[in-house]
Amino acid sequence: MVSQNYLVFVSAARQLCGVEAFSRLLARHFGARAETHVLDADMPGLVRALEGRDAVVFNFPIVGWKRQLFTPGLAAVLARLMGRDVVVFLHEWLALDWKRRIVLAPVVLCATRLAFSAPEIADEFARTRFARLVTRRRQVVPIPPNVLPVGAEKASDISRALSVQRQGGRLLLGQFGSIYPKKQSAIVLQVAAELVRQGHDVGVVFAGSFIKGLDNVEENFFASVRDLGLADRVTVTGYVAGDDELAAIFKEIDVFCYLFPEGLTSRRGSVLAAALSGHAVVVNAPLEANALGHHGLFQRLIETHAIRLVPTEADIPTVAAAVLAARQEPPEPLDAEAEIAKLWHSICEGIDA
């Protein structure tokens, strides 16, 4: 195993998407062997930054690079011309807009190593014709949570308002992460509506913000809220910058709930972050039995009942029943710090391999 020195590309964005959060955490866990570099059009600056570095690392898609059309490809070509390895992490592929895949194609062609966020992404990439043209050095890398448990909590107006609801006996159903159609956030509203129909006092907390640039996402979401009669029961926090503020919000949530079109996959860092908060997460099972086989932390969280799987195609009443059961049975204790450290060790070791 060769230990390389890395230059990890990031954006200048202040609000980080999950993929960029992973990029920055990756550089941090490599310690002195990695530096971050804001990807921009300053190629002379990149030449200087590459001094003493053996490889560059790209992660896609990063929201902060949406307007970068040629810069990623130029940076990858420059790195190869300077004799550096090019490591490319693909957290999505076919789910990306075809125009975005065209922009990324030159970078992937330059890659000396490809890493995928989940077996499903690796498989869908391998089935494309484009895959025949690129490196065969490919691996699946377990993606860690993008938000880590913190000991300190910082109360905010939002967390205080949630605390008042909870003290009044309301069950708070939660979801963490960006709100967008493929996450099926609106289905969680249906679960809440079913619980209300059964006579339970339920609120829903979305700890995150709507992804900008997607047409009518916010409007359609709030239309669903109104149609289901949940207008006075839904809280959308917007982007929460501080982990301590987020921890205070998480503290007030009774049960997290996710229902994905493809079931749970190992790239769902938001599910990991929610499960590590100490509250149970109800989520539909993966389509493939081995989807989480490479990810030790997901397996541990399922073993301790922090993650409670319902059938992949579970109907709303089944999920609602699972939420009520999870509220009554807290997860078993887990040494989150040790498990996360073990996961990062395996990630860094895998990239060096």
Enumerate the language-model features and the residues they cover.
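Glycosyltransferase donor-sugar binding loop
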Residues: 203-219, 239
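Acidic donor-binding loop of glycosyltransferase active sites
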Residues: 248-265
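Nucleotide-activated donor-binding/catalytic signature segment of Leloir-type glycosyltransferases, i.e.
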Residues: 218-240, 307-309
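A charged, aromatic-enriched C-terminal amphipathic alpha-helix characteristic of glycosyltransferases
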Residues: 310-352
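Conserved donor-binding/catalytic core segment of Leloir-type glycosyltransferases
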Residues: 162-183, 189-192, 205
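Short alpha-helical donor nucleotide-sugar binding micro-motif in glycosyltransferases
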Residues: 108, 239-240, 247-253
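Donor nucleotide-sugar binding/catalytic pocket of nucleotide-sugar-dependent glycosyltransferases
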Residues: 112-160
